[in-house]
């Protein structure tokens, strides 16, 4: 269901699309990276939290910041319903609750991974010419809570989308193919 559930914020940005499943994968990868860069954090727990934090959206749909001004979602009920009958239901519910409370180091890193996944998408849209992405980027970066995420965000914002494949030292490759 999550691979067919669209992230709805892009409607307001005017460009792009992403499913909740795509977002969760990106968030989990970023969460793993952040956990590896931050000492004393349980990386496996961060990855699980990143993978599970939007599971309720399989029942509720994705509610972006504009929607949340007007609609209240019963995420606890959605989580309880989707986890019902699973032998690991308590773990799923606990990880989602911990993510939402944002009190543990793992929850803070997971929340920052969630924001960095959006930041990466916004940076791509900016580099491709979206006129609204800059304002979104400024607001998104303000949500980051950990120093490791803030450092990564700074590096992302200073790097062009094509920099990884279009390096100056590889300029001859683009001409000669070698």
Q: For each predicted feature, which ranges?
A:
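Alpha-helical, largely C-terminal catalytic domains
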Residues: 1-178
